[in-house]
Amino acid sequence: MAKRVLIVDDDPAQRRILEGCIKRFGLESKTAASGDQALHILTGPEKDDIALVLLDLVMPGTGGMAVLEQLRGRPGSPPVIVQTAHGSIDGAISAIRAGAIDFVVKPASPERLEVSINSALKLQALSGEITR
């Protein structure tokens, strides 16, 4: 089974763009339109199918930072790459401190996303080897 990336963004156009990129990278995707929907997936029966999360920070309701806070320290949580149109250094630092593995500013180039995703998946695989 191909690795599945959970795309979490309230903007349907952004979700479609990211789905296309993920497919070109040879990965499968699943989408969530809100932080609540993402948490439902990441804590439900599908959680083991998700290898990585691409998470928008600014969404109505449960935002990206709240999702990160709820996932922090949870065993088996996939790596999270956060993305936002508000590329402040403070936002990036806060996201990394909250548990994100990387931070990209929208619109991110497909090349930048691919490097970030591949790095996160490799790091996750190495972490899995260490804990075995």
Q: What do these predicted regions represent?
A:
Residues 16-24:
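Charged docking surfaces used in two-component/phosphorelay signaling
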